[in-house]
Amino acid sequence: YVICTGFKRDQYVENIARLINNGQKNTIPIIDNYEELDLLQAEIKGKFKIGIRIAAEEEPKFEFYTSRLGIGYKNIVSFYKKQIQDNKNLELKMLHFFINTGINDTAYYWNELVKCIKVYVALKKECPSLDGLNIGGGFPIKNSLAFDFDYQYMIDEIINQIKIACDEAEVDVPNIFTEFGSFTVGESGGAIYQVLYQKQQNDREKWNMIDSSFITTLPDTWAINKRFIMLAINRWNDTYERVLLGGMTCDSDDYY
């Protein structure tokens, strides 16, 4: 499958249409707003599959309450009935559920998952062709040597919640799709830095100046305060000490 998410500008719509028109029938554009259906139908010949993205509600700490992407929980079933149900060129196959903070064992995540499952159940009763649930957001990756996350428990519990809800509503369980960006590639690479010089700036703080910049090579450290496993390559027999790592730029955020 080729799952096409996000807001779609003209070129994106044209590229999706070219895939489908050239025979890639398992290309599924995920509808992000009410106008995208018209844009896609103007470019795609014949019948094609679509999905709908749920506009999830964010954690209280976010600066906004509802995701900018997708269609609100309460509007999805009515949107399907008005614009999709009687359209013979459209086949709804997928509901897309994405949480910005990722999959975590928190009350917030389980609450949003339950709301998503309720939408799937309600939509499935109206739309027999719906058979896919795409769970985005992804698992966390190891960011310290003390990292402890029970992946198997989370997988089992998510599947269990979906199955219980579907069984109670007497609807078929969906095929599960996942989009785990960081989890998939987070440990596929690394960065090597050389310590050029150590500065003792006060009684408690030592700075190891490196031959690079965290702003350019590890931007998540300053942009979203992401932590990474940082280990010495050599001198493991030396006495350990607490240090701050400083990048080469003059920017005050260039440190770890």
Identify the meaning behind each predicted range.
Residues 1-132, 141:
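Active-site-proximal beta-alpha core segment in soluble small-molecule metabolic enzymes
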Residues 167, 171-256:
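Charged (often Lys/Glu-rich) extended helix/loop segments that serve as interaction or gating elements
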Residues 52, 95, 135, 179, ...:
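Conserved, mostly hydrophobic/aromatic
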Residues 105-111, 142-154, 185-199:
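Short glycine/threonine-rich loop-to-helix capping motif typified by GTGT followed
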Residues 116, 154-167:
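Alpha-helix-loop-beta-strand connector modules within alpha/beta enzyme cores
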Residues 100, 133-143, 178-183:
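Glycine-rich beta-strand-to-loop/alpha-helix junction loops that act as flexible
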Residues 59, 102, 144, 185, ...:
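Conserved protein kinase catalytic core
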